[in-house]
Amino acid sequence: MVISVATRVHSQKAEQALGLAQREIDRTRVLVERGNYTVVDLPPLAPGADQDAETALGANLTAAPTDYDHADPVDVNGDGDDDFLVQRYRVIGQEDGDGIPVAFAMGVRVYDIDVSGGGNLSTDPASLVMTSSDGGRGTQPLAVLYSTIATSDQGESLCNLNTYLRPNALPDQNEPSPTSGRLPDSCN
């Protein structure tokens, strides 16, 4: 019975954490798609982020231990007590002429509020198997999501996204447009 209760509690926390992570991704996506934002409105840059890391997704974004100081406490049930710590970050992506990111990779990690680790939290998600313990909630994130965020309705959106996804491609290696078989010349 102890295993059943512990597993149920862990699953409920993981489900809440996943929903919270998805809301953070969606909130940033809507902000960028609306187009009225500055760099300050976006998730902070990941430590050590550089131009070469811009298309890294999945495990490549989690190479360094996380910094506890950059996780924000969140109260999901409105009881006045924080339930989770949310860490949002991005890597340098494609910028417009004003230096505003218009395409970038973003990650969200959601930790239980009771995490320990003193600034050295794990980046591997906690296990969701049957357990009589905390299942890794003490040091590991309950939810980890990654996504590519990009503007989609501005004049240079297609070119910016293509440059972001294939920064080292030669002009003839770029993805074709539906009408001409190539991207517009302005993208090259």
Q: PLM features: what roles do these ranges have?
A:
Residues 1-12:
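C-terminal juxtamembrane segment of a hydrophobic transmembrane alpha-helix
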